[in-house]
Amino acid sequence: MPSSDPIEILLKHDRWATRQILEKCVPLTPEQFNQKFEIGPGSLHAATTHLVSAQRTWCDTLAGRPVRPHLDKEGKNRTPAEIMALQDEVSSEFFALVSAHPPDQTVTRERGGKTHTFTRGTVFAHVLVHGAHHRAQCINMLRRLGVTPLPPSSVVEWSFMGDK
């Protein structure tokens, strides 16, 4: 039976929805995957790399370790399959880190020379909303490239497809 825990549902959905985007990118040519659009990070490559990189950064914060360099700042042109492999690793770690501690526990992160304190629940909510925001941009880019059908992305669609 599928989980009824909203945190587990949202974590599983986030992983699944990002994978749906990346799977639709696999058959694209490198030119299509890197095509510039006036939305978000600017291309499917940039947006999906940013999504994984941001979640990895928040994993570092939740784990209490130094933040690793952003993947989207490396200038490496990854394939959709390479980004999918990174996403599998990062989303599994995020799931474990969110599940391991209470949401009211705090974590700190330095950014722009300032130290910020967040609850783990705030980080969880931010990462998932951030992911949904950029996935919507990716769906727009896929639509503009003529990809059909567009990938499913809602929690209900995820539920219909079997709680993966």
Residue map of PLM features:
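A short coil-to-beta-strand element that immediately follows conserved catalytic motifs
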Residues: 101-108, 149-152
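Short, contiguous alpha-helical
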Residues: 8-73, 112-164
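Helix-adjacent hinge/juxtasegments
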Residues: 64-104
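Residue-level preference for long, well-ordered alpha-helices that form the structural scaffold
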Residues: 3, 7-10, 79, 83
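Short, charged low-complexity linear motifs
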Residues: 1-2, 44
